[in-house]
A protein has these predicted regions:
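Intrinsically disordered, low-complexity prosegments and terminal tails associated
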Residues: 47, 52-311
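N-terminal export/targeting signals for secretion/compartment entry
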Residues: 1-77
Length: 311
């Protein structure tokens, strides 16, 4: 429980003008209406032959597709846990090296009477002690509806995010999450309970939060085991991320805020490839069902010699 409490408190500890607090607030802005206590910080194979067939499919649906959303994702997530367990653990980082990660992202933000989807690139460099550095580059905003764009123009075309921003990152508390599936389930369930949205949807978000950063095979396997036990997680099926990489997707629907959260994995390695938030009928923004309000594609992970170096 202490680890997830730390996970929630992480944003408040980040120094600098562009810190993890702001980054996490951006990720969760689409759901802040019902998540007041955590606005700043929150969130495959039915049978083996089915998975093999899915991977071979040439035409993959996008992860934002609505799909049938009827089959349980539990068998597939259990398979992902098995795949993770046999992955070779990465050698520990040594002094003078950093774990580099790059994400292609889009976050919903806005003002009075308008919202914009802001595309950008986030990069991080993580040192052996878990601390690091975050750099963000933001492109021109896009707008979910013409009314949003009109509202933005009427407001004087305010700058949503600066073109570039950066800040320090403290050590991630995810490094200390338990790898025993039962213990991890209890930890995540206790942290998710009573945080505005449904407990099941919040648990799904917390699992995704922990999968975003590189995790040991043991932790990744435990996270998939936990996800397999969350009620209502649906099998989406074959999918492609925004870079065109093929994988398999699962989803959780938060009925309180009418939002669908999709995760897409590489079934060969169990790595998280990307995620996407889409609105459903009855959402608080009154957007058409299927409107994308957030996404992240995990593009690059590598070891580099110093902060600022890119592979």
């Amino acid at each position: 429980m202490a680890e997830l409490d730390l996970l929630r408190s992480l944003p408040a500890t980040v120094a600098g003008p562009s810190d993890e607090a702001r980054a996490r607030a951006r990720e969760r802005l689409a759901r802040h209406i019902e998540r007041a206590p955590s606005t700043r910080r929150r969130r495959l194979l039915i049978l083996a032959v089915v998975l093999a067939a899915a991977v071979a499919v040439a035409a993959f649906a996008s992860i934002g597709g609505r799909g049938t959303g009827r089959a349980s994702a539990a068998p597939l997530l259990q398979r992902m846990a098995s795949v993770a367990r046999v992955q070779k653990a990465q050698q520990p980082l040594t002094a003078g090296h950093f774990e580099y990660s790059k994400w292609i992202v889009g976050y919903l933000s806005g003002g009075d009477g308008w919202y914009a989807l802001n595309p950008g690139v986030r990069e991080s460099w993580i040192a052996p002690n878990g601390s690091g550095f975050l750099h963000e580059r933001w492109n021109k905003p896009t707008f979910p509806t013409a009314a949003d764009k009109a509202g933005w123009i009427a407001a004087g075309r305010p700058q949503v995010y600066p073109p570039e921003d950066s800040g320090k990152l403290p050590p991630s508390p995810r490094r200390h999450l338990p790898t025993d599936p039962d213990e991890l389930y209890t930890t995540i369930h206790d942290a998710a309970a009573g945080h505005g949205n449904s407990t099941d949807a919040e648990m799904f978000t917390l699992v995704a939060d922990a999968l975003r950063d590189p995790a040991s095979p043991a932790l990744r396997a435990a996270l998939y085991d936990v996800a397999a036990r969350i009620p209502g997680v649906e099998l989406v099926g074959p999918a492609a991320d925004r870079l065109g990489r093929h994988g398999v997707a699962v989803a959780s629907v938060d009925g309180k805020i009418h939002e669908r959260h999709v995760l897409i994995f590489d079934p060969r390695t169990s790595a998280l490839l990307g995620e996407e938030y889409t609105q459903l009928d009855g959402n608080p923004y009154h957007y058409p069902a299927g409107t994308v309000t957030g996404y992240a594609t995990y593009a690059v992970s590598a070891i580099v010699d110093r902060i600022g170096i890119r592979p």
